[in-house]
Amino acid sequence: TTNGKVNGDKIKYKKVDFDITINIAKSCKKKNAKKFLFISSAGSNSLSSNFYLKLKGEIEESVIEIYNSSLFIFKPSLLLGSRKDIRIVEKIGQVIMSFFSFLLPKKIKAINSSLVAKVMLDFSISNLNGVYIIENKEIINHFK
């Protein structure tokens, strides 16, 4: 979700981001899904002073408690690609990060959402077990 969609209400934002992810993880575990994959964020950390990064870190920790095997957490930086809705601040960030892409280290470089999807698909059909945290740089380099 976005801050705009919940009018800046952090409780509503958390309800969407946290509750939906956790409920899906619980449901998948209950139905004996072999793997669980989800997208978090580069820089996520449950101890962060930034609301968004802290929330993403809390989600990761909670999902790890539920799904401690065959779990894949993808942590891309700013996602590039088309959206149905217009996110002005995000669009500005995409333009700026794309322009300066050659200067940025891979760990924070903007990444195309289609690449993230392809890497997720590749991990979903792998034979890997355990908890895997796939950082932005690893996503970028996955098929190289």
Where are these regions (language model features)?
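SDR active-site strand-loop-helix element
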Residues: 36-42, 74-76
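Short amphipathic alpha-helical segments at helix-loop
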Residues: 5-9, 43-44, 101-104
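A short small-residue
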Residues: 1-5, 38-41, 98
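A short helix->loop->beta-strand "cap" motif at the edges of active sites that frequently abuts
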Residues: 31-35, 67-69
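Internal, well-ordered alpha-helical scaffold/interface segments
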Residues: 22, 26, 34-37, 57, ...
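Oxidoreductase cofactor-interface core, primarily capturing Rossmann-like NAD(P)-dependent enzymes
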Residues: 46-143
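NAD(P)H-binding glycine-rich loop region in Rossmannoid oxidoreductase-like domains
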Residues: 1-23, 27-30, 124
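Alpha-helix N-cap/loop-to-helix boundary motif
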Residues: 12-20, 43-55
